[in-house]
Regions:
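N-terminal hydrophobic targeting/anchoring segments and the immediately downstream early-domain regions
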Residues: 1-13, 45
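A short alpha/beta connector and helix-capping loop motif
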Residues: 133-142
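Aromatic/hydrophobic pocket-lining residues that form π-stacking "cages" and hydrophobic walls in ligand
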Residues: 76, 142-143
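Conserved small/polar residues in nucleotide/adenosyl-binding loops
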Residues: 146-148
Protein backbone atom coordinates (compact mmCIF):
# COMPACT_ATOMS: atom_id res chain seq x y z
CA UNK A 1 0.00 0.00 0.00
CA UNK A 2 1.31 3.45 -0.88
CA UNK A 3 0.59 6.16 1.65
CA UNK A 4 -0.04 9.70 0.45
CA UNK A 5 1.84 11.19 3.40
CA UNK A 6 4.77 9.82 5.37
CA UNK A 7 4.21 8.39 8.84
CA UNK A 8 3.90 11.35 11.19
CA UNK A 9 4.05 11.41 14.94
CA UNK A 10 6.28 11.89 17.95
CA UNK A 11 9.45 10.09 19.01
CA UNK A 12 10.72 10.08 22.60
CA UNK A 13 14.43 10.49 21.81
CA UNK A 14 14.69 14.21 21.00
CA UNK A 15 12.58 15.18 24.01
CA UNK A 16 13.61 12.72 26.71
CA UNK A 17 16.62 10.75 25.42
CA UNK A 18 17.24 7.82 27.74
CA UNK A 19 15.10 9.34 30.52
CA UNK A 20 11.80 7.78 29.48
CA UNK A 21 9.10 6.12 31.53
CA UNK A 22 5.52 4.97 31.39
CA UNK A 23 4.09 8.13 32.97
CA UNK A 24 5.78 10.37 30.37
CA UNK A 25 4.50 8.22 27.53
CA UNK A 26 0.94 8.25 28.89
CA UNK A 27 1.09 12.04 29.30
CA UNK A 28 2.43 12.43 25.76
CA UNK A 29 -0.39 10.27 24.38
CA UNK A 30 -2.89 12.46 26.24
CA UNK A 31 -1.38 15.64 24.78
CA UNK A 32 -1.29 14.23 21.24
CA UNK A 33 -4.97 13.29 21.45
CA UNK A 34 -6.23 16.39 23.28
CA UNK A 35 -4.17 19.04 21.44
CA UNK A 36 -5.44 18.08 18.01
CA UNK A 37 -2.13 16.66 16.78
CA UNK A 38 -3.70 13.24 16.25
CA UNK A 39 -6.51 14.77 14.21
CA UNK A 40 -3.96 16.55 12.01
CA UNK A 41 -2.32 13.23 11.09
CA UNK A 42 0.30 12.89 13.83
CA UNK A 43 -0.79 9.38 14.67
CA UNK A 44 2.39 7.60 15.80
CA UNK A 45 3.81 7.70 19.32
CA UNK A 46 7.23 6.01 19.25
CA UNK A 47 9.33 4.96 22.24
CA UNK A 48 12.98 5.19 21.22
CA UNK A 49 16.12 3.58 22.69
CA UNK A 50 16.71 2.75 26.39
CA UNK A 51 13.32 1.19 27.18
CA UNK A 52 14.60 -2.33 27.91
CA UNK A 53 16.82 -4.05 30.40
CA UNK A 54 20.42 -4.47 29.30
CA UNK A 55 20.04 -8.27 29.07
CA UNK A 56 17.51 -10.48 27.31
CA UNK A 57 15.53 -13.03 29.31
CA UNK A 58 16.30 -16.77 29.39
CA UNK A 59 14.22 -17.22 26.19
CA UNK A 60 16.15 -14.55 24.31
CA UNK A 61 13.33 -12.01 24.52
CA UNK A 62 13.69 -8.30 25.12
CA UNK A 63 12.44 -7.23 28.55
CA UNK A 64 11.03 -3.77 29.27
CA UNK A 65 12.78 -2.07 32.18
CA UNK A 66 10.32 -2.60 35.08
CA UNK A 67 11.46 0.61 36.77
CA UNK A 68 10.61 2.65 33.68
CA UNK A 69 7.61 0.62 32.47
CA UNK A 70 6.16 -1.17 35.52
CA UNK A 71 3.03 -2.34 33.70
CA UNK A 72 4.92 -3.60 30.64
CA UNK A 73 4.76 -2.62 27.00
CA UNK A 74 1.40 -4.25 26.25
CA UNK A 75 -0.22 -1.93 28.81
CA UNK A 76 1.57 1.04 27.25
CA UNK A 77 0.41 0.02 23.77
CA UNK A 78 -3.15 -0.43 25.02
CA UNK A 79 -3.13 3.07 26.53
CA UNK A 80 -1.69 4.65 23.38
CA UNK A 81 -4.27 2.82 21.24
CA UNK A 82 -7.07 3.94 23.58
CA UNK A 83 -6.20 7.51 22.56
CA UNK A 84 -6.68 6.69 18.89
CA UNK A 85 -2.92 6.62 18.23
CA UNK A 86 -0.56 4.03 16.81
CA UNK A 87 2.23 2.66 19.00
CA UNK A 88 5.82 2.46 17.82
CA UNK A 89 9.01 1.11 19.32
CA UNK A 90 12.72 1.18 18.63
CA UNK A 91 15.23 -1.53 17.87
CA UNK A 92 18.48 -1.82 15.98
CA UNK A 93 20.05 -4.01 13.30
CA UNK A 94 23.19 -4.46 15.38
CA UNK A 95 23.85 -6.65 18.38
CA UNK A 96 23.39 -3.52 20.51
CA UNK A 97 21.32 -0.39 20.09
CA UNK A 98 23.04 2.96 19.70
CA UNK A 99 22.83 3.43 23.49
CA UNK A 100 24.16 -0.05 24.27
CA UNK A 101 20.96 -2.00 24.95
CA UNK A 102 20.25 -5.36 23.25
CA UNK A 103 19.85 -5.02 19.49
CA UNK A 104 17.96 -7.35 17.17
CA UNK A 105 20.91 -8.91 15.34
CA UNK A 106 20.33 -12.70 15.25
CA UNK A 107 17.11 -12.16 17.25
CA UNK A 108 15.00 -10.68 14.45
CA UNK A 109 12.26 -13.30 14.56
CA UNK A 110 11.91 -13.47 18.34
CA UNK A 111 11.89 -9.66 18.48
CA UNK A 112 9.21 -9.49 15.78
CA UNK A 113 7.10 -11.96 17.78
CA UNK A 114 7.66 -9.92 20.94
CA UNK A 115 6.69 -6.64 19.29
CA UNK A 116 3.61 -8.29 17.78
CA UNK A 117 2.57 -9.65 21.19
CA UNK A 118 2.67 -6.07 22.50
CA UNK A 119 0.57 -4.79 19.54
CA UNK A 120 3.35 -2.57 18.18
CA UNK A 121 2.25 -0.82 14.98
CA UNK A 122 5.54 0.76 13.89
CA UNK A 123 9.22 -0.10 14.27
CA UNK A 124 12.00 2.47 14.16
CA UNK A 125 14.99 0.35 13.17
CA UNK A 126 18.44 1.88 13.65
CA UNK A 127 21.85 0.76 12.35
CA UNK A 128 24.39 0.86 15.19
CA UNK A 129 26.81 -1.91 16.22
CA UNK A 130 26.04 -3.92 13.08
CA UNK A 131 28.10 -6.82 11.83
CA UNK A 132 31.05 -5.63 9.72
CA UNK A 133 30.53 -8.66 7.47
CA UNK A 134 26.84 -8.10 6.80
CA UNK A 135 25.56 -4.89 5.30
CA UNK A 136 22.33 -2.99 5.77
CA UNK A 137 20.55 -4.49 2.79
CA UNK A 138 20.74 -7.96 4.36
CA UNK A 139 20.00 -6.81 7.92
CA UNK A 140 16.96 -4.75 6.95
CA UNK A 141 15.67 -7.56 4.72
CA UNK A 142 16.00 -9.95 7.68
CA UNK A 143 13.87 -7.81 10.02
CA UNK A 144 11.38 -7.29 7.19
CA UNK A 145 11.00 -11.04 6.77
CA UNK A 146 10.52 -11.42 10.50
CA UNK A 147 7.61 -8.96 10.48
CA UNK A 148 5.75 -10.51 7.55
Amino acid sequence: MIKLTPPMGWNSWNTFGENINEKMIFETADVMAESGLRDKGYEYLVIDDCWSLRERDENGRLVPDPEKFPHGMKAVADYVHSKGLKFGMYSCAGNMTCAGYPGSYEHEFVDAETFASWDVDFLKYDYCYHSPILHGKYLYRQIGRAHV
